[in-house]
A protein has these predicted regions:
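Hydrophobic core
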Residues: 15-23
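N-terminal leader/targeting segments
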Residues: 3, 21-22, 30, 160
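Conserved active-site-adjacent core of cysteine acyl-enzyme catalytic domains
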Residues: 35, 72-195
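Active-site-adjacent structural segments surrounding the nucleophilic cysteine of cysteine proteases
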Residues: 6-9, 24-95
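A broadly tuned, weak detector of single residues within folded domains
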Residues: 12-13, 56, 148
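Bacterial N-terminal signal peptides that target proteins for export
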Residues: 2-14
Length: 195
């Protein structure tokens, strides 16, 4: 797929029945045509008070579409309409009342916005390689530092040998920190019902 004469790939943790993925969890990736450090455009779920996604709010349950918005704007330089992306997630069945967005929101919205997804699995080396090539990596996190249940974040770049910067669409404080890539991979959520 082409996106403004640029192919984009978004990476997100995936499970069963997604984009030629196996039954084990994976990470979906989005590519650029050039290998360079990604200039990150940040969106936060709290910036849309009262805006809805299904029966909830973007602030409470819109992390998946907001993470895709970070990738879209970072890859294209265009402003994303986060509330519109959330409405599309609901319309296409990627949002489940009381549970949030499913793992399929990332490849689904990516396709709608002209980005091509590629599965990476939970392979630390593959994630590191994608980040060093300037590709954003969307990860669905499980219980730990980022969430009690499930939460999408965007890994944006490597820092040194084994640290990573993350655009956490639910926390500016966590976005300002640098994280161990091993720790992030360990906290990634596996399974098709993640998120």
């Amino acid at each position: 797929m082409r996106l403004n004469k640029m192919t984009g790939r978004v990476i997100a943790t995936m499970g069963i029945a997604a984009m030629m993925m196996t039954q084990t969890a994976g990470v979906m990736a989005a590519e650029q045509t050039e290998n360079k450090q990604l200039k990150v455009v940040y969106y936060n779920q709290a910036d849309y008070p009262g805006k809805k996604i299904g029966g909830s709010t973007i602030q409470a349950a819109g992390c998946g579409p907001t993470a895709v918005a970070v990738c879209y704007s970072s890859l294209t330089g265009k402003k994303a309409d986060v509330p519109k992306m959330c409405k599309q997630a609901y319309k296409h069945g990627w949002y489940y009342t009381g549970q949030g967005c499913s793992h399929s929101v990332v490849p689904g919205l990516s396709k709608l916005y002209g980005m091509e997804c590629k599965g990476l699995g939970m392979d630390k080396d593959a994630v590191e390689k994608a980040l060093r090539a300037g590709h954003p990596v969307v990860a669905l996190m499980g219980p730990g530092d980022f969430t009690k249940n499930g939460h999408f974040v965007v890994l944006t770049r490597m820092v040194g040998k084994d640290k990573v910067k993350i655009a956490d669409v639910g926390s500016r404080a966590r976005t300002a920190e640098t994280w161990s890539l091993k720790k992030v991979i360990r906290q990634g959520k596996e399974g098709a019902n993640a998120g």
